[in-house]
Amino acid sequence: MDQLQQSLLDAPIIEKNGYHYFVHPISDGLPKLDPTLLREIVIRIIRKAELQDVDRIVTPAAMGIHISTAVSLMTDIPLTVIRKRKYGLEDEVAISQQTGYSENEMYINDVRAGERVLVLDDVLSTGGTLASVLEALDGIGAEVIDTVAVIKKVGGENKVDDAGYDVKTLINVDVVDGEVVIVDEHGDS
């Protein structure tokens, strides 16, 4: 069993507004993120993602940053972070981020029409964040070459699927009776 799978099986579960969440180093920054787990994830992303001719990696703040930074370092592909703070720059595009538990504004800067991007994120749950990001990138005119989320939480609404976007994942899980259940140890391809 790989580290990602074992770390998910060991993850504590919390409930917030009737929604069950696993607490995991990749999605929450705790418990501690072991470098060997991060390395395993980065290697799996590099093997799974379409990287040919990608101009930049794009990731939403905050929990996609550590994953995307490591992938950027390994591939020499520049990184742009979609921020939760407005800067008011000329090319700034505001997007509405709707998750299972909140709604916020996020801001894309420095992504231009025609750029070929790889979108990376930590978790695909309701799909609200990734659907908003992918729609905004389409609106900018960027070409999304591939989208990868480390963990997919199955069951329930998925706005990414509903919007017709394809997202690769490294592992698919569900939360059943207060425990993480591995649905697909290889994720979606």
Swiss-Prot record:
Its EC number is 2.4.2.-. The keyword Transferase applies. InterPro entries: HGPRTase-like, PRibTrfase_dom, PRTase-like, Pur/Pyrimidine_PRTase. One of its GO terms (biological process) is purine ribonucleoside salvage. It is an enzyme of class 2 (transferase). It holds the Pfam family Pribosyltran. Keywords: Purine salvage, Transferase. GO terms for molecular function: transferase activity. PROSITE patterns: PUR_PYR_PR_TRANSFER (PS00103). It comes from the Archaea. May catalyze a purine salvage reaction, the substrate is unknown. Belongs to the purine/pyrimidine phosphoribosyltransferase family. Archaeal HPRT subfamily. This is HGPRTase-like protein 1. It comes from Natrialba magadii (strain ATCC 43099 / DSM 3394 / CCM 3739 / CIP 104546 / IAM 13178 / JCM 8861 / NBRC 102185 / NCIMB 2190 / MS3).
